[in-house]
Design a protein with these regions (language model features):
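Thiamine diphosphate
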Residues: 1-241, 245-251
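A short alpha/beta connector and helix-capping loop motif
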Residues: 84, 93-96, 263-282
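Short acidic/glycine-rich loop or secondary-structure boundary segments that cap or lie
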Residues: 210-212, 262-265
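Active-site metal-binding loops of divalent metal-dependent hydrolases
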Residues: 257-259
Length: 282
């Protein structure tokens, strides 16, 4: 395993001091390290992976320096448009490094929503014409150096693939404060306790879906009117809106996440335009 301090020093040695992207569990330790060292680097948390490509393009255009975009491979699809129509060497030729966490790696146990992208990620990068390195402990320093040089020389994005367990443990120093005094799980329980059993419920990606499912089980309730959006982060609100429009006689509750909502905020305008009165967005 590689320490977060070690890889940070390698980036620094190669003149890389700009990082932007969307958090990923495989990269969690390293991202926590980046956040703790924001006074020494430039760090932008992007709304989605496509926006992160835009951030790093703006950084390069204004500084002539290569930056890093980090993401989970499930978010690669969000980045394909700007990668092919903006950063590609046949368009503007913007050098950058893509640091991609490899969920759903073939042969490894992972959640169902990660299996397809885990299988097709490397072939997809090949089709996109994006060179890549699968980082390993022994060659990491040389791999990053070569990737940066290749990106600059060929005016192209280059990907650094990170497998699960690549980073050693790191405990974040910065802690988030308790703003509302009500945790996510308590909020879900409070709302569910008001249900009469006839509602349709949509829950967004991640822990919200998991916590709703666990609470249903703990109370001996059925899941037949729940839809757990295990993937497709940011699209639960579109799913819930359309269900509400098609089933106006039903109350439709959406448990959404702040990060998921920010990822595709434009859907809020669509919801506002069609304004289904039976949709409750929480």
């Amino acid at each position: 395993m590689i320490s977060c301090e070690n890889i940070h020093e390698v980036f620094k040695k190669n003149g890389i001091e700009y990082f932007t992207g969307v958090p990923d569990s495989i990269l969690k330790e390293w991202i926590n390290y980046v956040v703790d060292n924001e006074d020494k680097i430039v760090h932008r948390i992007a709304a989605n992976e496509g926006a992160a490509i835009g951030h790093v393009v703006g950084y390069y255009l204004s500084t002539d320096k290569v930056g890093v975009v980090y993401m989970q491979n499930s978010g690669l699809g969000n980045a394909v448009n700007p990668l092919t129509s903006l950063a590609d060497s046949d368009v503007f030729g913007i050098p950058m490094l893509l640091m991609i966490g490899w969920r759903g790696e073939p042969g490894k146990n992972d959640a169902p929503q990660h299996k397809k992208m885990g299988k097709v990620m490397l072939p997809l990068l090949d089709v996109l014409g994006i060179p890549y390195e699968i980082l390993n402990d022994e060659d990491m320093s040389e791999q990053i150096k070569n990737a940066k040089e290749k990106a600059k020389k060929e005016d192209t994005p280059v990907a650094l693939i990170v497998k699960k367990g690549f980073f050693s443990g790191y405990i974040a120093k910065k802690k988030e404060g308790d703003i509302l005094g009500l945790c996510r799980e308590e909020a879900i329980h409070t709302v569910v306790d008001t249900f009469n059993g006839d509602e349709i419920v949509v829950a967004t990606t991640g822990k919200i879906s998991r916590e709703l499912s666990e609470y249903r089980q703990a109370r001996g309730q059925k899941h037949d009117k729940d839809f757990y959006v295990v993937g497709s982060m940011g699209h639960a609100c579109a799913i819930a809106m359309e269900i509400a429009c098609q089933r106006p006689e039903k109350k439709v509750y959406l448990f959404d996440g702040d990060g998921a909502l920010m990822m595709h905020t434009g859907t809020m305008a669509t919801i506002g335009y069609y304004a289904p009165e039976n949709l409750f967005h929480i």
